[in-house]
Amino acid sequence: GILSLVKGVAKLAGKGLAKEGGKFGLELIACKIAKQC
């Protein structure tokens, strides 16, 4: 369901954030979640 999808995305995002780092990554995720890019 939706929750497992979100968890999967969060895992991928976490790996991406570990590489890219910090605020920009979080803003990008928030933007994608809110669909207000």
Swiss-Prot record:
Keywords, in A-Z order: Amphibian defense peptide, Antibiotic, Antimicrobial, Cytolysis, Disulfide bond, Hemolysis, Secreted
TM helices/strands, residue ranges: none
Localization annotation: Secreted
Covalent S-S links between cysteines: 31-37
GO cellular component: extracellular region
Family matches, as InterPro entries: Antimicrobial_frog_2 (IPR012521)
Tissue specificity: Expressed by the skin glands.
The organism's place on the tree of life at top rank: Eukaryota
Protein's UniProt keywords contain Transmembrane: no
GO BP term, pick one: killing of cells of another organism
Pfam families referenced in this protein's UniProt entry, alphabetically: Antimicrobial_2
Function: Shows antibacterial activity against representative Gram-negative and Gram-positive bacterial species, and hemolytic activity.
Protein name as catalogued: Esculentin-2A
